[in-house]
Regions:
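Post-transcriptional modification and biogenesis factors for structured RNAs
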Residues: 1-184
């Protein structure tokens, strides 16, 4: 079986015209450096605009981040801020929709959500979730559908699911000639 070189997997595809996905991620008090590294790697792969690392969330240079990110920490724009509220206020002032990823009852199903780009998606602490004051600032709350009994995903895994759903939806908006079938 012939292997396609990794660098060539997007060549000539409907993704070429996208360039950068007009989306950012804000990590609020994500404690695991490995999760932070995984977000860097996913952000790089999906062409995410920026990572905002807030509170106790680790930031480069940290060995555990580098180990998981595999160099993506050098290619993805990022910034650290101890307080996330001013970051959210600045993003909102620049026209971003602010969305929290939570398992709350009032959250919209990820596959039904129609994000307004540019968008910033917030992920919180692995156990405690997003701070209430930050959650209250969000324009929308989004949940990933879960059929199992745990109703829980690792935060970096959840990030991958949400980021790639954003890419799918943005591709359909930016390249109508090659839309993906909507979820029904």
């Amino acid at each position: 079986m012939d292997r396609i070189p990794f660098q060539a997997t997007a060549a000539g595809s409907p993704y070429e015209s996208i360039g950068t996905l007009p989306a950012a991620v804000l990590l609020d008090n994500v404690r695991s450096m490995y999760n932070v590294g995984a977000f860097f790697r996913t952000a790089d792969a999906a062409g995410l605009e920026k990572l905002h690392l807030c509170g106790i969330t680790g930031y480069p240079p940290k060995r555990a981040i580098t180990k998981t990110a595999l160099g993506a920490e050098a290619s993805v724009p990022w910034e650290h801020a101890w307080e996330p509220v001013p970051v959210v206020e600045a993003l909102r002032g620049r026209g971003y929709e602010i969305a929290a990823v939570e398992t709350s009852a009032h959250a919209v199903d990820l596959f039904d959500w129609q994000p307004r780009f540019p968008v910033c998606v917030i992920f919180g602490h692995e156990v405690e979730g997003i701070r209430p004051e930050l959650s209250a600032m969000c324009d929308t709350h989004v949940r990933i559908p879960m059929l199992g009994i745990k109703h829980s995903l690792n935060v970096a895994t959840a990030g991958g699911v949400v980021i790639y759903e954003l890419l799918r939806k943005y591709r359909a908006l930016s390249n109508p000639a090659a839309p993906l079938a909507p979820y029904k």
